[in-house]
């Protein structure tokens, strides 16, 4: 199961008591700000979570897997995410969801 923007908005509605419309707008604004920062070449640092960074990949040789023909892979910018130490540690020590939900009644 994936966590979606709708799930986050629903959680904000439930936990903070703000309207569903405000919760959805808050989530949209949050992600829009991240997108705009990355588009303008800025790094995005979220304390306790991680960093979103832009990386420039140079042109490199590639190969068409169907024909075997050599083709150049063009240079491009990509977004990378580097998790922070707190996030790494919490994920490393977390129980997988299927284990947490397993109550042994099988």
UniProtKB/Swiss-Prot annotation:
GO MF entries: DNA binding; structural constituent of chromatin
GO terms, biological process: DNA recombination; positive regulation of metabolic process; regulation of DNA-templated transcription; regulation of translation
Superkingdom of source: Bacteria
Lineage: Bacteria, Pseudomonadati, Pseudomonadota, Gammaproteobacteria, Aeromonadales
Subunit structure: Heterodimer of an alpha and a beta chain.
InterPro entries listed in its UniProt record: Hist_DNA-bd, Histone-like_DNA-bd_CS, IHF-like_DNA-bd_dom_sf, IHF_alpha
Biological source species: Tolumonas auensis (strain DSM 9187 / NBRC 110442 / TA 4)
Any GO CC annotation of this UniProt entry: cytosol
Family, as annotated: Belongs to the bacterial histone-like protein family.
Protein name: Integration host factor subunit alpha
Keywords: DNA recombination, DNA-binding, Transcription, Transcription regulation, Translation regulation
Cited PROSITE patterns: HISTONE_LIKE
């Amino acid at each position: 199961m994936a966590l979606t923007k709708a799930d986050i908005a629903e959680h904000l509605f439930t936990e903070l008591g703000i309207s569903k419309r405000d919760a959805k707008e808050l989530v949209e604004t949050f992600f829009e700000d991240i997108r705009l920062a990355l588009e303008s070449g800025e790094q995005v640092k979220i304390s306790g979570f991680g960093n979103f960074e832009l990386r420039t990949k140079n042109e490199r040789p590639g190969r068409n897997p169907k024909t075997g023909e050599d083709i150049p892979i063009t240079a491009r910018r990509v977004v990378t995410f580097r998790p922070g130490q707190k996030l790494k540690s919490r994920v490393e020590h977390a129980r997988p969801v299927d284990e947490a939900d397993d109550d042994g009644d099988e």
